Amino acid sequence: MTLNRKCVVIHNGSHRTVAGFSNVELPQCIIPSSYIKRTDEGGEAEFIFGTYNMIDAAAEKRNGDEVYTLVDSQGLPYNWDALEMQWRYLYDTQLKVSPEELPLVITMPATNGKPDMAILERYYELAFDKLNVPVFQIVIEPLAIALSMGKSSAFVIDIGASGCNVTPIIDGIVVKNAVVRSKFGGDFLDFQVHERLAPLIKEENDMENMADEQKRSTDVWYEASTWIQQFKSTMLQVSEKDLFELERYYKEQADIYAKQQEQLKQMDQQLQYTALTGSPNNPLVQKKNFLFKPLNKTLTLDLKECYQFAEYLFKPQLISDKFSPEDGLGPLMAKSVKKAGASINSMKANTSTNPNGLGTSHINTNVGDNNSTASSSNISPEQVYSLLLTNVIITGSTSLIEGMEQRIIKELSIRFPQYKLTTFANQVMMDRKIQGWLGALTMANLPSWSLGKWYSKEDYETLKRDRKQSQATNATN
């Protein structure tokens, strides 16, 4: 194999799938991580992939059409037959290359435990048995993002569609015990936006705006992929501080202003002149307009309401008492940092590789070796805090909401006031959305094959033989 290799790079995120080649900086395609299943008159099932194909199919509003996802809330595949069809669609329609021709690199989310061996085996089965890929590599997404930015230690905050994932990385190693996540992300905001705007966009005697239980899954997906996305990108904002604190501040300012006006009125009566009148500036009552194109209707909301949507990510208990305040983004980040500091002394034990070879743990198998873990296990928790908080990486599509980076800095500074904070967030919107794929692209372009953990079909066959022998031995015992 030569150093000037070309690989296929596929990133299956919870919302979108990105695919391309390692020798091209931009992906070949970005499609939804879902598909529409349609049954024709003959009873044959048709599977529709691709953004425009799915939008066109959903707009037809055909009875029986349903939208299905490929990955679960953890970002791991569960619909393997559909995943195979999606990859074949990518190879045949978008990449226009045979799977047998090029190596394959894919991403996998970080978890707070050892990767499920069953998940890894299904990946290898799909790659080697069904697609006949020559060699194959799985990279941990937040680790790839950190290394692609030149950071061996980082605190990766990924605010995506299915939720928020917080991953601390020390010396190129994911601190598995400190990986935390919440279910509050872009999809959660989609639902809240729909619930809030439904009464505003519903017209009298409009049969298309009936109760949600009568909507098809294709209708829900279509709305989330069109006008709701536009609403979130243009209307939503994150307040720099707690929204309740902001309201209290402006209320206090209004009270002070009222007292000043009362004093001026008394002076007016004594000095016989008219004081200037006006009102204090309260940005929360300013209006923002959104054009709802399906009905050509303008929707008007207070700025406070625009802040309120994003506030749910930091305080989910505002929606329901059933949601814990600990699942808010602020407590989640603090929990991850503290757990990383507490568990760093046992990291060396957590980074041992699986003797079977294919089931790798969240160790940086792509750079360095286990010698680097010895130094990381000797640092103090305070040093871990400082190392993480000076290398905060903010990524994910939902992190693009205006004001998100400033609010994250505020939340961390409240909980760790004695530490310096440094954040890194890609300011190019598209790059932020596909940063997981860009990280995998970097890992695919390492200068030497030996720096990456590549697996061949022979390795997979060896694993299967060893597993069968182990099962036979256990059965006889």
Curated annotation (Swiss-Prot):
CDD domains: ASKHA_NBD_ScArp7-like (cd10212)
Pfam families given in the database record: Actin (PF00022)
GO function terms (MF aspect): chromatin binding; structural molecule activity
Main location: nucleus
One GO CC term on file: SWI/SNF complex
Locations listed in the record: Nucleus
Domain of life of the source: Eukaryota
Gene Ontology BP terms: chromatin organization; chromatin remodeling; nucleosome disassembly; positive regulation of transcription by RNA polymerase II; regulation of DNA-templated transcription; regulation of transcription by RNA polymerase II; transcription elongation by RNA polymerase II
Keyword Nucleus: yes
Alphabetical keyword list: Chromatin regulator, Nucleus, Transcription, Transcription regulation
Entry function: Component of the chromatin structure remodeling complex (RSC), which is involved in transcription regulation and nucleosome positioning. RSC is responsible for the transfer of a histone octamer from a nucleosome core particle to naked DNA. The reaction requires ATP and involves an activated RSC-nucleosome intermediate. Remodeling reaction also involves DNA translocation, DNA twist and conformational change.
Additional remarks: Present with 1360 molecules/cell in log phase SD medium.
Assembly and binders: Forms a heterodimer with ARP9. Interacts with NPL6. Component of the two forms of the RSC complex composed of at least either RSC1 or RSC2, and ARP7, ARP9, LDB7, NPL6, RSC3, RSC30, RSC4, RSC58, RSC6, RSC8, RSC9, SFH1, STH1, HTL1 and probably RTT102. The complexes interact with histone and histone variant components of centromeric chromatin. Component of the SWI/SNF global transcription activator complex.
Protein name as it appears in the record: Actin-related protein 7
The gene coding this protein: ARP7
